[in-house]
C-alpha cells in the first residue's frame, strides 16, 4: 500500500504533497500553488480526486490524483454559497457537503463523474456550522452548529436535497460548541469534539431512524489546565481502538483508548505537538498520526505505539504558511 499525505496551507496558498513510507518517513513530491486560501480537503471515495475548499472567492476545486504517486492536476471548480470551513463527500461519490462557519450554512454540490457541477441545496440558520459528516450507512448527514450547541440531522435524498430527520437535532451541554466528528468502524457510535469546553461526546446510534443518545462526555484536558479551551480536530484509527483529539491553546493531542464495542472512551495520555494544531489525521494502516501546526508552519509524524495508542515522534517537516488541514490517501 502506497500512501500520500496532503497538507493545506492557506497563508501561502499551497498544498504540499508527501509520500509516506512504511517506516513513517515523509518525502516531498509536489508543491501545488492554489488560486486562493486553501483550507478543507477530502479525497473522493474512488480515490480519483482531491476536493478542496478555497476563499476569498468561495469555491470547491477538484484535483485529479495520479494513481502511481498521488500527484495533483487541476480538473474543475464550482462556486459555493459561503466560505468553506469543512468539506466531505457521501460514500458513493455523488455529492460534496460543505459546512460554512461564517455563512452559517451547509451546502450540497452535485458531482458528475467525480467533478463538481453546481450546488443543489443549501440549508441556512446553522450558526457556527463547522462540519458535515455522513453516517456510515450513507443516510444521515450530521451537521454540528457550534454556536447553537446542537448537531442537526438531515436525510440526504437521491437528488442531494437535505430533509430534516425526526428528531431533527441532538443537543450538547450549554457552551460545549460541537465542531468535528468521526464514526466508529462498527457504525454504532459517533464521537464529537467540542471546541469551547474541549470535551468529547460519545453518541450511540441506537437505530437507523435517528434514535441517538449521548452515553459519555469526557474532558480532554489535563486536570490542572486553566487556560482558554480551544479544541479543534478528532480522528480514530481504522481498527477503532484509539481516538485522538487536539487543543490549539495547549498545543496538545489527547490520546484515548476505545472499548471493544465503541461505547466507552478512556483517557490514556497527552502528546505535546506543533504550535496551535488546527488539523491532524491518522494514516490508513493505523500506525502513524500526522499533525500540523498552524503557528509553527511545520508538521510532525508520530508512530502509534502499544495498547494505549501513545504517540512517539518520528519526524518533523517544514510545510507552507499556516497549515490547517491534513489528508491521507492510500493507493
Swiss-Prot record:
It catalyses: 6-phospho-D-glucono-1,5-lactone + H2O = 6-phospho-D-gluconate + H(+). The modification N6-acetyllysine is found at residue 287. One of its GO terms (biological process) is glucose metabolic process. InterPro entries: 6-phosphogluconolactonase_YbhE (IPR022528), Cycloisomerase_2 (IPR050282), Lactonase_7-beta_prop (IPR019405), N2O_reductase_N (IPR011045), WD40/YVTN_repeat-like_dom_sf (IPR015943). Pathway: Carbohydrate degradation; pentose phosphate pathway; D-ribulose 5-phosphate from D-glucose 6-phosphate (oxidative stage): step 2/3. Pfam families: Lactonase. The keyword Electron transport does not apply. The keyword tRNA processing does not apply. It comes from the Bacteria. Belongs to the cycloisomerase 2 family. Catalyzes the hydrolysis of 6-phosphogluconolactone to 6-phosphogluconate. This is 6-phosphogluconolactonase. The lineage of its organism: Bacteria, Pseudomonadati, Pseudomonadota, Gammaproteobacteria, Enterobacterales.
Amino acid at each position: 500500500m502506497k500512501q500520500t499525505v496532503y497538507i493545506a496551507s492557506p497563508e501561502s496558498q499551497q498544498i504540499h504533497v508527501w509520500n509516506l513510507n512504511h517506516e513513517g518517513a515523509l518525502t516531498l513530491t509536489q508543491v501545488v500553488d492554489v488560486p486562493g486560501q486553501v483550507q478543507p480537503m477530502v479525497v473522493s471515495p474512488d480515490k480519483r480526486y482531491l476536493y478542496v475548499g478555497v476563499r476569498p472567492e468561495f469555491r470547491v476545486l477538484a484535483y485529479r490524483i495520479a494513481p502511481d504517486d498521488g500527484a495533483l492536476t487541476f480538473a474543475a471548480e464550482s462556486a459555493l454559497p459561503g466560505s468553506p470551513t469543512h468539506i466531505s463527500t457521501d460514500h458513493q461519490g455523488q455529492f460534496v457537503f460543505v459546512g460554512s462557519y461564517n455563512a452559517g450554512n451547509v451546502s450540497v454540490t452535485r458531482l458528475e463523474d467525480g467533478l463538481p457541477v453546481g450546488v443543489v441545496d443549501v440549508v441556512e440558520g446553522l450558526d457556527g456550522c463547522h462540519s458535515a459528516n455522513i453516517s456510515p450507512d450513507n443516510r444521515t448527514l450530521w451537521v454540528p452548529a457550534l454556536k447553537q450547541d446542537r448537531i442537526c440531522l438531515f436525510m440526504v435524498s437521491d437528488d442531494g436535497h437535505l430533509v430534516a430527520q425526526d428528531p431533527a437535532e441532538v443537543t450538547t451541554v450549554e457552551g460545549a460548541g460541537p465542531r468535528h466528528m468521526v464514526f466508529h468502524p462498527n457504525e454504532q457510535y459517533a464521537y464529537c469534539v467540542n471546541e469551547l469546553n474541549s470535551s468529547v461526546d460519545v453518541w450511540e446510534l441506537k437505530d437507523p431512524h435517528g434514535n441517538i443518545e449521548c452515553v459519555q462526555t469526557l474532558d480532554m484536558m489535563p486536570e490542572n489546565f486553566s487556560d482558554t479551551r480551544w479544541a479543534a480536530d478528532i480522528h480514530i484509527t481504522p481498527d477503532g481502538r484509539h481516538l485522538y483529539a487536539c487543543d490549539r491553546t495547549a498545543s496538545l493531542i489527547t490520546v484515548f483508548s476505545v472499548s471493544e464495542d465503541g461505547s466507552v472512551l478512556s483517557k490514556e495520555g497527552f502528546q505535546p505537538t506543533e504550535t496551535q494544531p488546527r488539523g491532524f489525521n491518522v494514516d490508513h494502516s493505523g500506525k502513524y498520526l500526522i499533525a500540523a501546526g498552524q503557528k509553527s508552519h511545520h508538521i510532525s509524524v508520530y508512530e502509534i505505539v502499544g495498547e494505549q495508542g501513545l504517540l512517539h515522534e518520528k519526524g518533523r517537516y517544514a510545510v507552507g504558511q499556516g497549515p490547517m488541514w491534513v489528508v491521507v490517501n492510500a493507493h
